């Protein structure tokens, strides 16, 4: 099914005591991935650029051990062993405090371990050192979990859609919409997503995520027909991706 036509113009939290809403299209802990690390140095699983950055920022005499320890941290992260990734990432940080890549991976490991304050600290350092907003959606989500929705929206507003991948920009808008909903600004949250390009010729994962979140917000706002149409669009694109088919049936039956 194609996305629904335009209609007239729903609070998700991720903190420890959150009343969780279904996540759109992929689990929350899959939000935020390190930049590409495939490499010619296959045994290290690091790009040549990353290796150069590590050696350039390492404390004197620590370049080789830093590359080894950080490589192991990245490997643990890839395997979902976030405790080990954090332990090795902290060791890496002490050897190269100004390495943006180290702070980025460590922040993402803390994020996936639901350790919001530590994640925000490290991802803020990554943002400051690198000048990149690539991880702002994840950083903003940390502030949502810490019940600071206004700061979350500010971080999402920093993301320039012309300078990041579309998926990053859309993710920022999704997080911002959730933060607005956290503050009870449901109509603003809906309007934020409705301003996106939601009717592409070919729908990518980030489009489906935006459709799902918009459907969720509309349902929570009591706009059930429009919500059902967006869930139908998600289900039509990939019936296995989310619980959209079940939500369609529930809305059809009025449950």
Predicted regions and their residues:
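TPR/TPR-like (Sel1-like) alpha-helical repeat modules
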Residues: 129-133, 161-162, 191-198, 219-242, ...
């Amino acid at each position: 099914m194609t996305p629904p036509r335009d209609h007239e113009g729903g609070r998700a939290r991720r903190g420890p005591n959150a009343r969780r809403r279904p996540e759109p299209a992929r689990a929350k802990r899959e939000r935020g991935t390190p930049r590409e690390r495939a490499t010619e140095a296959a045994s290290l699983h690091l790009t040549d650029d990353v290796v150069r950055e590590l050696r350039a920022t390492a404390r004197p005499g620590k370049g080789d051990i830093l590359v080894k320890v950080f490589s192991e941290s990245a490997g643990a992260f890839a395997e979902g062993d976030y405790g080990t990734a954090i332990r090795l990432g902290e060791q890496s940080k002490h050897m190269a405090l100004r390495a943006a890549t180290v702070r980025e991976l460590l922040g993402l490991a803390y994020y996936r371990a639901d350790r919001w304050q530590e994640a925000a600290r490290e991802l803020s350092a990554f943002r400051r050192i690198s000048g990149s907003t690539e991880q702002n959606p994840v950083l903003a989500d940390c502030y949502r979990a810490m019940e600071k929705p206004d700061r979350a929206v500010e971080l999402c507003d920093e993301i320039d859609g012309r300078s990041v991948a579309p998926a990053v920009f859309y993710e920022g808008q999704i997080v911002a919409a959730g933060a607005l909903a956290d503050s009870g600004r449901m109509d603003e949250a809906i309007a934020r997503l409705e301003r996106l390009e939601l009717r592409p010729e070919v729908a990518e994962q980030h489009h489906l995520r935006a459709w799902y979140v918009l459907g969720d917000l509309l349902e929570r706002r009591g706009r059930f027909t429009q919500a059902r149409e967006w869930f139908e669009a998600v289900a039509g694109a990939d019936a296995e991706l989310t619980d959209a088919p079940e939500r369609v049936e529930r809305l059809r039956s009025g449950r």
